[in-house]
Amino acid sequence: MMKALVVGGSSGIGLSLVLQLLHSDKVEKVYVVDKAAFPESHREERVDYVCCDLSRNDFSVLNRMNDIQALYITAGFGHLDFFQKLSEPYIDDSFAVNAVAPIKIIHRYYDRLLAQEDFACAVMVSIAGRISSPLFSVYSATKAALSKFIEAVNVELEVQGSRNRILEVSPGSLKGTGFTGGESQPELTADLAKEIIEHATRHEELYIPQYEEVFKDVIARYEADAHKFGVESYWYKKNSGRA
């Protein structure tokens, strides 16, 4: 039997991960840490929800969750707009929630990653952290920081003899997550949640959904000419009505 922690598990892909974990009879408990309340429609006795605002930099609620064998961090937010329109509090909160909180939470459980026992760990990053993303300047900066952190720490885990790794999950836009507003639709992200759990359980380091179909070409175009790619990215967002 195992216990898992899902940070950001009340909505979006986090909620889908919780529901997929609960499908397994090997899962004894799923801790859910989120600012938003866990949906009543999905509550059951194996779900242990605790309210926590990651922007407050207080993770003491995790003190009693030291018996987990899997960690999934999905909390994060972003706002599409010109940089000059973003407030300083927004910038502070963006880095606190999207980058600092995941890093500090992983630090709390790092002894589990270093140990010889299996410890599954996955963090939702974003393809925006790997390419030029105008109008997502601060969001992409927070995700780039997180991506580089994961990349470096995975090497540290390897050279210290651990087989555990942190899985970076870097998708593009996802339907059903409620990221850009609206309700979460976990049925639309169920397959992705299954994939994340499988990749994390295999101790893989990077998972980009739809890589072959979409993002292999996207990344190649960015690496060929980052400036041209950035300009095209801006106009794509503008012409598609996202900006």
Give the positions of each predicted feature.
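N-terminal Rossmann NAD(P)H-binding glycine-rich loop of SDR-like oxidoreductase domains
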Residues: 10, 14-19
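Conserved NAD(P)H cofactor-binding loop of Rossmann-fold oxidoreductase domains
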Residues: 74-80
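Substrate-binding pocket helix/loop in short-chain dehydrogenase/reductase
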Residues: 82-83, 90-93
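Active-site helix of classical SDR
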Residues: 106, 142
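Residue(s) in the substrate-gating loop at a strand-loop-helix junction
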Residues: 126
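Active-site loop immediately N-terminal to the catalytic Tyr-X3-Lys motif
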Residues: 133-137
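C-terminal helical subdomain
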Residues: 164, 168, 180-221
